[in-house]
């Protein structure tokens, strides 16, 4: 357990950057849970060095300092971190009570973390205006009191770092139209969903809400091009993101929803995932299994090509592990839902 007998020692330190979607995901989660925490803005290595704490490998934001074997250790990766916090802080749960719905939440959280991030990285560096904006603001998110010459130096470094990462998310001239259309479709579905329900899976946020929220903080609050798109077609989404930043005051009611209670908009979202997130996750896993450095696939609306990404292959394996944990009747219920929305290959591929 993360909790100790001393309240003071249960104030968790975490490092990140305001322009990091996963940092924003975890801050909003901790606020909703009312878990005491301190946010440290700054370069991870610079912050950890005086503490004699080794940085995680690789360094992914945010970085939490958590007790491991009697000493503080730098820990990263938001999804298992949320699970660890949920086990220690069961009040105000972000996992649905219903087992089938909890699995759907797990898939949607991964969709937010692994597909919606493609929107974010694509828009941040694909267009000149967005790349210039990111190059200027990313270093200022770490330290604002720097000279113009220092800013120019850091701007070049940050811009290069962002562009070098595009291969991971598959952003290129060939895939750009598909990413743009997928982002707009996602916004339209979420906009329609928010007309009838305040959160993705009920009356209070689940972990999948925070995953989607994290990416959207950047898409509508940092990068010019996707922000303009969102303001044109999804005003409810904009309001939703702004309010989810701090839901510590939301009084949580018992959530007794089941899979059959999900509105049509969630089915629509999974159908959208079936032509984007699902086939690319499976193609990437196949490439990793075959030892291929890159892969391509024909999607309904165009060709997708990118370098193989080992971490996302692990994500698909974890989804299957979660599915195998389900009771037989719940497994059948989930499979029917996935099959209805053309996503069953998430749990059947490579069987």
Regions found by a protein language model. Give the residues of each.
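All-alpha amphipathic helical-bundle segments outside canonical DNA-binding/catalytic cores
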Residues: 97, 102, 197-207
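Active-site/pore-lining binding-face segments in mid-to-C-terminal subdomains
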Residues: 213-304
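Short glycine-biased active-site loop of nucleotidyltransferases that positions the nucleotide triphosphate
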Residues: 3, 49-58
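C-terminal non-catalytic accessory extensions
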Residues: 305-351
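Single conserved hydrophobic/aromatic residue that forms the stacking wall/gate
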Residues: 1-8, 12
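N-terminal G-site helix/loop of the GST-like fold
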Residues: 13-43, 54, 80, 89-91
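GST superfamily/GST-like fold recognition
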Residues: 200-220
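Internal, well-ordered alpha/beta segment that forms a basic, Gly-enriched binding/recognition surface
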Residues: 57-59, 67-181
